[in-house]
Design a protein with these regions (language model features):
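C-terminal cap/substrate-recognition subdomain and adjoining C-terminal extension
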Residues: 24-41, 46-47, 127-129, 138-235
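Ser/Thr-glycine-rich phosphate-binding loops at phosphate-binding pockets of nucleotides
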Residues: 71, 134-136
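Short, acidic loop-to-helix structural element flanking the phosphoryl-transfer center
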Residues: 103-132, 139-140
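Short, surface-exposed acidic
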Residues: 14, 91-95, 155-161
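Non-catalytic pre-domain segments flanking phosphatase-related domains
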Residues: 2-66, 229-235
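Generic beta-sheet signal
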Residues: 62-64, 131, 185
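Active-site neighborhood of HAD-like aspartate-dependent phosphohydrolases
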Residues: 40, 52-110, 126
Length: 235
């Protein structure tokens, strides 16, 4: 009898030590995720400013180009203001020359320089590289963008911004002619068009991440064309 009681106690203690297996009583209604899935990184070719610096060590100075909006500047406030003023709820303002005249005249004094752009430009200028800015914006009647960029990033040898929007093109992507014109080796940008323009020009395109609260939606797919993506580049 005593042995039977002991066996019963052992069985009860063993059962208590084994965690209960949870059962899914209702089917999920949304995709969701779990802790293990969240730890799985996408197969993206990440790169850092420090890695780029080491890679370029000992090499002759090169020409590099940068897109502006969401690449070097967080300029969404300007575009949000323009949309509210010229075409609330629509994107027609992007085809309105009055908007481009206004935004390019000086709105970027309220745009926020991205830290990743500061770090990249400092690294390239320390090497003696030439910096160019190539944007998909349409030119306004006054260029207030060039001086803002020169001051924000302390550009030593500033070149006028290349406004590619609205130009007649012989290429598929509007930034390609600017990249070719300035004999660029590396082009940095946040959009698919930046990466595809670099490919079309036959140069290296490196993606910077767009801030999650950018007015430029939908968000592009990082590494979607096999390009390198800079880490910590959304700000």
């Amino acid at each position: 009898m005593k042995n039977l009681v002991k066996l019963s106690l052992v069985a009860l203690l063993t059962a208590a030590a084994i965690p209960a297996m949870a059962t899914k009583t209702e089917p999920y209604t949304n995709q969701g995720t779990n802790a293990r899935e969240m730890l799985v990184e996408q197969p993206i070719h990440w790169i850092s400013v420090e890695q780029l610096k080491k890679e370029l060590e000992g090499k002759a100075p090169i020409n590099v180009s940068f897109d502006i909006d969401d690449t070097v500047l967080f300029s969404s406030p300007c575009f949000y203001h323009g949309q509210q003023k010229y075409s609330p709820g629509k994107h027609d303002y992007l085809k309105n020359q009055d908007f481009w005249n206004e935004v390019n005249a000086g709105c970027d004094q309220y745009s926020i320089p991205k830290q990743i752009a500061i770090d990249l430009i400092n690294m390239h200028q320390a090497r003696g590289d030439q910096i160019y800015f190539i944007t998909g914006r349409t030119a306004g009647d006054k260029d207030g963008v060039t001086p803002v960029l020169q001051k924000a990033f302390n550009i030593k040898d500033m070149h006028p911004v290349e406004f590619m929007g609205g130009r007649e093109l012989s290429t598929k992507y509007n930034k390609t002619p600017g990249i070719i014109k300035h004999k660029v080796t590396i082009h940095y940008g946040d959009s698919d068009d930046d990466i595809l323009a670099a490919k079309e020009a036959g140069v290296r395109g490196i993606r910077l991440m767009r801030a999650a609260n950018s007015t430029y939606q939908p968000m592009p797919t990082l590494g979607g064309y096999g390009e390198e993506v800079l880490i910590n580049s959304s700000y």
